[in-house]
Each structure stands twice: as C-alpha cells, then as structure tokens.
C-alpha cells in the first residue's frame, strides 16, 4: 500500500508521465493506493508509468509504461527475455528468413498503440506504421516491433538512435 505524492502526476525523463507514489508515514492517515489495482483502474488506460519514493531526482523505483503493460498482460512487472541472443538490429542478412506482420492486440493492445501514436505525433512523426518482425535465432524465433522511421527523418544518427531507444519506454 502506498500514499499518493503531491503532485500526483510528474513528467519524468524524456517527457514521459509518471504517477507519484510514496511509502505511508507511520501513524498518519492516508488514502491507500494499491499498485496492482492502479494498473487496471487507470495506469494502463492512460499510458502512465509510476515513480515510487522520489527524493530529489532519485526514486527508489521507477516503472515505465512498458512495465505497467507487462503487469497488465503477464501479472509481473518484469519478465526475463526468453531468448538471450538477439540478432543484430537494423540489418537482415541475405539468407535470413523473417516473417513480417501486424502485431496482435494481445501483443500490442490498442491502449499501447494509442499511447505510442500520441508520443510519435508529439515528436512530429505522423502516420508511423508498426509491424511485428519474427526472426530465427539459434535459440528459436524472436519477435521485435519495427517502425517505419528512418535516420533521414532526424537531425543526425545519434538523435535517431536516441529516439528509437526512447520507444522502449512503452
């Protein structure tokens, strides 16, 4: 059980929204917030992460929206990757077999698509397509979301790479 911080909603690194929670103070009455209930009640729907016990700029714990989504889908905030050997990003080898398709709603729920669309549009990228790429590795198939974004749409390669990295928040 947590109590709510003031303000309730903060803008964190990268401009992402976080709901602020604090440990309750001993002997002080408070409105109880239960994280597992909050996911279903509003966090998942609104596209918010959670910051816990923020002191200065240092939280005890930070849950991205992707962590919230993982909890909604799998009832755990973190799931270890099933395959540790990921293929090189961005390059499909000449003889590599891949499958490209539309991600299902169970893999990428409409609420997540909406939050990603809003983020992309906020940063000036309208109509971005998202696909699911399945690649074979020595450990079996691995699935990755891909976006029709190109380095030419950004000021330089580091800005492009940083933006792609920021999509990991979801």
Model region roles, listed by residue range:
Residues 1-170:
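An interfacial alpha-helical scaffold signature
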């Amino acid at each position: 059980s947590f109590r709510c911080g003031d303000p309730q909603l903060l803008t964190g690194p990268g401009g992402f929204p976080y709901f602020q929670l604090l440990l309750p103070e001993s002997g002080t009455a408070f409105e109880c917030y239960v994280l597992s209930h909050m996911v279903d009640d509003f966090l998942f729907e609104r596209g918010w992460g959670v910051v816990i016990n923020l002191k200065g700029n240092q939280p005890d714990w930070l849950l991205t929206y992707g962590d919230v989504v993982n909890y909604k889908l799998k009832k755990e905030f973190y799931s270890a990757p099933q395959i540790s050997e990921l293929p090189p990003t961005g390059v499909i080898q000449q003889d590599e077999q891949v499958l490209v398709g539309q991600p299902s709603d169970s893999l990428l729920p409409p609420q997540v698509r909406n939050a990603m669309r809003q983020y992309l549009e906020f940063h000036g990228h309208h109509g971005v397509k998202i696909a699911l790429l399945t690649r074979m590795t020595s450990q079996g198939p691995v699935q990755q979301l891909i976006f029709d974004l190109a380095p030419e749409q950004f000021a330089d390669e580091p800005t492009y790479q940083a933006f792609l990295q920021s999509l990991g928040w979801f």
